[in-house]
């Protein structure tokens, strides 16, 4: 063969092959689904390119995939007459994994076989799945529009290297031959192969044909029998499609091994005509937070495949949605640039967004357990919604889930509708607190009075929460209120104090003046508070000041953080505050006040500028 060379696999390929063969063996038949799915993609790509260059069909426009086997040679062959590959494409697609973050993904895999198989399934193994059942794979291919002598040969045993060479191939497309491992004879059985193809390929539009050999007049006559329906699933009537078919189609388009949580199939006629089939996965893709992660729907125009990952039809906070849209209103020569500025696209995006939010609302209402699975996988992404989509903010807010003081659990199961239904008589606001962790939120001294009054507080501990709450200002006409900020409604709760207590407070006015004089500009104000029951002091921020959590977000992003000026609030009923107020020695008084302030800052921020000084002060006061 001309131009023959032997190349080494990209190191990640070797590791993936090893893990895949061991992790996916229990579900080994999926290799056929993956290879037929790739053939379907190759046909879609040829149809799309042929829109502008019909000569690419080379007089053969009847696209199909064929499956045949040779029992004597123990080979199984999957061939298509799709777009084919050039030599460079063969090296690029079959010798490397062109995905960012592959190395870190592989490092995340461990020895848990069930978990590994799920992760590898999410990764989309495609062509490499052939090595689950084959100890050698041979590929012969020629790209559409290339001369026969520009065919390409590729072969590998999946060990560490592969051979590539130039060949002559008369027909366009790709032929993959699997040299089956010992013990894999089931894939040489006609009935077994037929059943696998029927299971995985009934929903794709490409005809899948299996070879039939018959003896006639002493000669072997070869014919091809179509064994799938070869009708695009989304074009069929919903009443004719089984749940199993919907699930298999999801696995086909998403390259996911897991069943979806739910789906929505709709045909819309009228001003705009389109069909959509949208799925909510049951597990987040491993690279969902990678900036290079592609997302979006498959786009078809009048049943002709146009592109993968058309992100223009779904907002970023719904990037986990998989599926397709088939539009009758877009031109066949549509490009990503045209989609960006198209009124049709904007209208479709708005309609599909509402469809997904309704689908999630229905899931939450009908199956709380499944919705909790969704929330655990995609809740953080959905929390981007209130800032990105003001038009649907109320609908998104209904889907949010939180931990709260109502449940003694860090699980985020409380909806805003749940919270509102439990609000106390006369309560006008929805109270919440943001913190670095659930434990920090739950034990915050800011909650003491609210707990005493039996008022529920939402406990927010995801990094995105503070940012989200800047945009989510109310729900069901009720404003949100952070309990770590000074607020009139909180003051009202705290001011329910008897007259004798108020008289006692007046006596502490000189003490407050001494504290103000000592701390000066380091705090915004010093005041007494009745918001505390067990804690001597807290710090809080004014309504118009940057919160502690927002300051942390700025710092983590490397941005300049404006100084946060706290209001220092002291509990007049606490023994430590009384002791400080009774201390006449100025040095000792200073130690007490600084210690109380440090305690309050530590509870609020989780850190101190000088923890050693704090420890020294505490030790001195303990021994004095």
Swiss-Prot record:
Phosphorylated. The keyword Ribonucleoprotein does not apply. It is found in: Cytoplasm; Cell inner membrane. Residues 1-336 are annotated as: A. One of its GO terms (cellular component) is cytosol. Belongs to the heat shock protein 90 family. The gene is htpG. Molecular chaperone. Has ATPase activity. This is Chaperone protein HtpG. GO terms for molecular function: ATP binding; ATP hydrolysis activity; ATP-dependent protein folding chaperone; identical protein binding; protein folding chaperone; protein homodimerization activity; protein-folding chaperone binding; unfolded protein binding. Residues 553-624 are annotated as: C. Residues 337-552 are annotated as: B. PANTHER family: HEAT SHOCK PROTEIN 90 FAMILY MEMBER. InterPro entries: HATPase_C_sf (IPR036890), Heat_shock_protein_90_CS (IPR019805), HSP90_C (IPR037196), Hsp90_fam (IPR001404), Hsp90_N (IPR020575), Ribosomal_Su5_D2-typ_SF (IPR020568). Keywords: ATP-binding, Cell inner membrane, Cell membrane, Chaperone, Cytoplasm, Membrane, Nucleotide-binding, Phosphoprotein, Stress response. GO terms for biological process: DNA damage response; FtsZ-dependent cytokinesis; protein folding; response to heat. The keyword DNA-binding does not apply.
């Amino acid at each position: 063969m001309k131009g023959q060379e032997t190349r080494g696999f990209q190191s990640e390929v070797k590791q993936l092959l090893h893990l895949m063969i061991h992790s996916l063996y229990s579900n080994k038949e999926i290799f056929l689904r993956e290879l037929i799915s790739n053939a379907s993609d190759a046909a879609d790509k040829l149809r799309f390119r042929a829109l502008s260059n019909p000569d690419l069909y080379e007089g053969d426009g009847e696209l199909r995939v064929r499956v045949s086997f040779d029992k004597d040679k123990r080979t199984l062959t999957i061939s298509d007459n799709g777009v084919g590959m050039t030599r460079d494409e063969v090296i690029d697609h079959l010798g490397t994994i062109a995905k960012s973050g592959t190395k870190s993904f592989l490092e995340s895999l461990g020895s848990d076989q069930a978990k590994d198989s799920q992760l590898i399934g999410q990764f989309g193994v495609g062509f490499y799945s052939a090595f689950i059942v084959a100890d050698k794979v041979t590929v012969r291919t020629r790209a559409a529009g290339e001369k026969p002598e520009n065919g390409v040969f590729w072969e590998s045993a999946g060990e560490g290297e592969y051979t590539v060479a130039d060949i002559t191939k008369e027909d366009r497309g790709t032929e993959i031959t699997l040299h089956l491992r010992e013990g894999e004879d089931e894939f040489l059985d006609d009935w077994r192969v037929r059943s696998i193809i029927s299971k995985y390929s009934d929903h794709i539009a490409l005809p899948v044909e299996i070879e039939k050999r018959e003896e006639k007049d002493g000669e072997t006559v070869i014919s091809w029998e179509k064994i799938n329906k070869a009708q695009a699933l989304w074009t069929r009537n919903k009443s004719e499609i089984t749940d199993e078919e919907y699930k298999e189609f999801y696995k086909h388009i998403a390259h996911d091994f897991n069943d979806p949580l739910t789906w929505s199939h709709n045909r819309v006629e009228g001003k705009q005509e389109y069909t959509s089939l949208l799925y909510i996965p049951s597990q987040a893709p491993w690279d969902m937070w990678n900036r290079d992660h592609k997302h979006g729907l498959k786009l078809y125009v009048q049943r002709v495949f146009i592109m993968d990952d058309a992100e223009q039809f779904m907002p970023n906070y719904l990037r986990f949605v998989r599926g397709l849209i088939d539009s009758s209103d877009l031109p066949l020569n549509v490009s990503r640039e045209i989609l960006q500025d198209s009124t049709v696209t904007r209208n479709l995006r708005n309609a599909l967004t509402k469809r997904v939010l309704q689908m999630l609302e229905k899931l939450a209402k009908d199956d709380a357990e499944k919705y909790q699975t969704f929330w655990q996988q995609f809740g953080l992404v959905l929390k981007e919604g209130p800032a990105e989509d003001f038009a649907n903010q109320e609908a998104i807010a209904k889907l949010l889930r939180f931990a709260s003081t109502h449940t003694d659990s860090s699980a985020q199961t409380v909806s805003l509708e749940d919270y509102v239904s439990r609000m106390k008589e006369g309560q006008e606001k929805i109270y919440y607190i943001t913190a670095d962790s659930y434990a920090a939120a739950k034990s915050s001294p800011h909650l003491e009075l609210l707990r005493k009054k039996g008022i529920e507080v939402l406990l927010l501990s995801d990094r995105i929460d503070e940012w989200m709450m800047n945009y989510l200002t109310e729900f069901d006409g009720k404003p949100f209120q952070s309990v770590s900020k000074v607020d009139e409604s909180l003051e009202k709760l705290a001011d329910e104090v008897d007259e004798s207590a108020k008289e006692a407070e007046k006596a502490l006015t000189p003490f407050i003046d001494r504290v103000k004089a000592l701390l000066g500009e380091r705090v915004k104000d010093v005041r007494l508070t009745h918001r505390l029951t067990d804690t001597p002091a807290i710090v809080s921020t004014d309504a118009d000041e940057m919160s502690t959590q927002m300051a942390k977000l700025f710092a983590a992003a490397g941005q300049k953080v404006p100084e946060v000026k706290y209001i220092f609030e002291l509990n007049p009923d606490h023994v430590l505050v009384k002791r400080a107020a009774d201390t006449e020695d100025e040095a000792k008084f200073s130690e007490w006040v600084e210690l109380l302030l440090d305690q309050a800052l530590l509870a609020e921020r989780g850190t101190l500028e000088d923890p050693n000084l704090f420890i020294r002060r505490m030790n001195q006061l303990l021994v004095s």
